[in-house]
Amino acid sequence: MKTNTGTSEISPAGLNTFKYKENTFGYVSGLALLNSMGVSTQVPANIEIYTNNETATVRDIQVGSQKVTLRKSRTIINSDNVAVLRFLEMMNTVSPAFFDDDNKAIIKEYISSNNISRQSITKHAPVFPDKVMRNLIESEVIYDIA
C-alpha cells in the first residue's frame, strides 16, 4: 500500500479490519471467527475470509508472514446480514458437543446483541450446508433465538 512516506505492508489484522470489516463486504471465518467471538482460545495459523470481492471459489494469499485464504461468499454480504452470516458460519464450523454452558452464554449474548432472528436465519440458511440447521437444533441454540 502506498503512503506519504513510502510503501507500507498491511498486517493481517489490519487487512481484516480495513478491507473486510469496515466496508462490510466480507467476514472472518473458521478458527479466527471462533476466536473473535470469544468461544475459542485457539489462534489460527491461517485466516479465512469470505468476501464479495472474490471471483475464485478459494484463493490463498500471503500478507506479511500470515497466510490468508479468501473464499467467495455464499451470498451477498452487507451490513444488514453480516452478523447472521457470521453466526451461521460459526454453526457450520463447530459440532453440537462444542456448546457447553459457557459457550452457549457467549453465543446467546452474540445473538441478542446482533438482533439475530429466526426470520433472518431462515432467509440465509439455504445457502449453507444442512449441517448448520442440524447443529442449531442438536445444540439447542435455536431456543435462544427470538
Predicted stretch roles:
Residues 1-19:
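Short beta-edge/loop segments at beta->alpha junctions of small alpha/beta modules
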Residues 17-18, 25, 29-32, 90, ...:
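Positively charged, aromatic-accented nucleic-acid-binding surfaces
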Residues 1, 22-57, 62:
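Short gly/ser-rich loop at a beta-strand->alpha-helix junction or flexible surface loop bordering the NTP-binding
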Residues 9-11, 29, 117-118:
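A diffuse structural propensity rather than consistent per-protein peaks
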Residues 64-72:
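A short, charged helix-loop
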Residues 41-43, 62-65, 82-85, 102:
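Surface-exposed beta-strand edges and their flanking turn/coil or helix-capping segments
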Residues 4, 16, 23, 35, ...:
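Detector for Asparagine
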Residues 71-146:
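Hydrophobic alpha-helical interaction segments
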